[in-house]
């Protein structure tokens, strides 16, 4: 069983993007200075966790992917359609990412932004509890 962290999710998505678009740079932070187009930015906008029972948690993540380029609008739309296919089912070993709601996207000032909601079910293992050692006491009663 793999440990699920926010970095695991972002890395899984960036790996899928890199497989489809090997010539594009992919950033995992919001650095805008010195970026080389075309490129993607991948980051988590927000997350939420809800306890299902003592060992199971449901985690919701809203992922934002931005595509910066000098492409025309039809070319950007083509990238958007390819991303819809890629992001609808991503698998990395035991981790499977499928959106829980429709994927939304918009193009503003030539920048494609996609919003992808994922839900994961996380199983927490009980931490081993330290038990006390035996205590031998010797006493006398008077």
What are these regions (language model features)?
Residues 1-27, 47-142:
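Charged, amphipathic alpha-helical segments and their flanking helix caps
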Residues 27-35:
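Short acidic low-complexity segments
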Residues 35-37, 60:
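Short gly/pro-enriched beta-turn/loop segments at secondary-structure junctions
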Residues 37-45:
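A short, hydrophobic beta-strand-centered structural micro-motif
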